Amino acid sequence: MSRLAECTISDTVDELVQRAKLAEQAERYDDMAGACKTMAKMRNELNNEEANLLSVAYKNVVGARRSSWRIMSSIAKKQAGTPLAHQHDIYLKKVEEELIQICNDVLALPVLPITEKIGAEAKIFYYKMMGDYYRYSAEVQEGEQNDKSTEAAEEANQKATSLAEAELSVTHPIRLGLALNFSVFYYEIKNMPEKACSLAKAAFDAAITEVDSIKDETYKDSTLIMQLLRDNLTLWNSECETDS
């Protein structure tokens, strides 16, 4: 199984931050995640820059495996019953194991579980991260393991949503990103398109009324996520109307 390269504990946090940035520029995301993982072990709480580096690193690392899994899963289905079926199943299992290990690595980081000491925005950020990585696990799991990951993902997203609705503006990119990912969870994992549409539409409609008040530094991120919400609603709309 592939393992992420980790840095030594003798590296300072500043050195690890710089190493993560360098790895990001080189698009070496396994190296970036290794630096961020070591950094997270050295800190009780990450600042915004460190948390964002951690998020970007693992998003790309797990994203590559999710893409591989989808490709291999499609190939395995087409090859079912052929002489190559067993070989494809073995390779698919290897990708699944890598993906789940990465998710477990994230969920085992010292910044999770979430403590009362950190601020509301950080709590929302980490609960959202928990929800995402439990969802990624559920995508490839079956049976009891799938049920456990699905339940954990929903619980983390619900906690993040309750906090976000109380603490963040409707145009805040973290709140919008949470709504985007939670709606995808309902659509893809829970197979509840009507719930997914309702959540995505509520987030988009609330944000569009306040679009003129978005701060300059978050305008690009917020409007991009709003566009993704609208794209999903367009894609899901026929199913939502059928289920209504």
Swiss-Prot record:
Top-rank taxon: Eukaryota
SMART domains: 14_3_3
Alphabetical list of Pfam families matching this protein: 14-3-3
Residue stretches spanning the membrane: none
InterPro entries according to UniProt: 14-3-3, 14-3-3_CS, 14-3-3_dom_sf, 14-3-3_domain
PANTHER family the UniProt entry points to: 14-3-3 PROTEIN
Family: Belongs to the 14-3-3 family.
Name the record gives this protein: 14-3-3 protein homolog 1
Organism: Echinococcus granulosus
